[in-house]
Amino acid sequence: MASNQHSQRERTPDRSAQPPPPKMGRYFLDSESEEELEAVPLPPKKKVKKSMAAIPLSPESAEEEEAEPPRAVLGVMGFSMPPVRIMHHADGSQSFQKMETRQVHVLKASAQNSDENEKNVVVVRNPASQPLVSAWEKGMEAMAMLMEKYHVDHDERATFRFLPDQGSVYKKICTTWLNEEKRGLQLTFSSQKTFQELMGRFLQGYMQAYAGVQQNSWEPTGCCVWEHKCTEREGELRCLHGMEMVRKEHLVEMDVTSESGQRALKENPSKAKVAQNRWGRNVVQIKNDDARCCFHDVGCGNNSFSGKSCGLFYSEGMKAQIAFRQIEAFMLADYPHMRHGQKRLLMPVRCECLNKQDGLPRMGRQLCKITPFNLSNVDNIDINEVTDPGALASIKYPCLLVFQCANPVYRNARGNAGPNCDFKISAPDVMGALQLVRQLWGENFDGSPPRLVIPEFKWHQRLQYRNISLPTNHGDCREEPFDF
């Protein structure tokens, strides 16, 4: 056994140390030297194509198997011909991808569109470096300040949510401001309640404009700017349709013992007379030959309107035209440099009866009633002693336009009384309510008030006079209407 192992070791060659290979000699010709001999460049090596996906290593855990391979990210767009994409991979390597002609055209078109979009983009910055808030928060913050300053009840402040149907809060703010700043304010043919109501509506409109809130189906002021065209020609008036009103005869009969009858005898002794009506009762009759009505009401009797009428009627056309000229001169006194508002009238179109958000039409007129009122005891005022231009306008034209409830009900009136209210305000006081709200705003906020765009009046069929009311649904908690 030992001899066999010894013989096997002898046959195994020794691999421990091998002699180095012989050095290669370098020989030069007689005409050459080592310095003159140029090295021959080696041929370029082929670049390894890195576009091929590298073979991933075998994962060592289950988590590595489930992980998605990193995606390549477009880093640079080459300017070679043909163009190539240089893609950056997650492992730090790069790859090159050729682009087709169609892809190049798509990229050029998208780049042109992005340049055009950048030209139309408006960059909005916050110059005050203040946090941006929503319109609702902006309005709530301003109203919280006003409600606290003008002593609105705590319960109403807690329930206030800056909603369009919370107009009573604005009215209370204006009422407190009037009592503190404008005590003893004089109004002409206007009630304090209606004046405060309109101020609250204007304040609500300014607050919504300040906050940037706009209600598409609800206008808070309930007013319009009407281009009436009632002073362009002598004796010509226009109704709300924009058409010329028709002249007709109008006979008014009043009870002799009533307040209106006694006032008619005192103010119009030349026209009013006591006579017997067809039932043999003594009444005060006033016959007006200059009454004006809508052209749809030519065939209708007194206090009757057709289904297409606008509901506008003047018992004395000349008095109405004087009232329109009065408000023109009155506005020109306050705004002598105005260019667009002279022939326009700011008029409320929704009284308290119509100031509902349900959008349902009411019986009768759908707009406020417009009536010209005489200014008594103006003839004895000397114009040379008066310097106020607004007062001079009223002295020169002693009639005022008064806006009342759409369907007023008078005392001792016969028939069923429909929905009515005590809404009553004159045209100069409507402008006064707007001006006082601007003063209130200037006392509590810096800068000028926001733009309050009051809509311009345009006739629509939904404003026609309605002789029949829609059926009313009163509601019921039962599931079935009848018992079976």
Swiss-Prot record:
Location of region: C-terminal arm, DBP binding: 468-484
Biological process according to GO: DNA replication; DNA-templated transcription; positive regulation of DNA replication; viral DNA genome replication; viral DNA strand displacement replication
Sites where the protein binds Zn(2+) 1: 239, 241, 294, 310
Low complexity compositional bias, start-end: 51-60
Chain spans, region Flexible loop: 252-286
GO cellular component: host cell nucleus; viral capsid
Residue numbers binding Zn(2+) 2: 351, 353, 405, 421
Region listing for Disordered, in residue ranges: 1-69
Modified residues (Phosphotyrosine): 150
Family to which the UniProt record says this protein belongs: Belongs to the adenoviridae E2A DNA-binding protein family.
The protein's name: DNA-binding protein
Organism, scientific name: Human adenovirus A serotype 12
Taxonomic placement: Viruses, Varidnaviria, Bamfordvirae, Preplasmiviricota, Tectiliviricetes
Gene: DBP
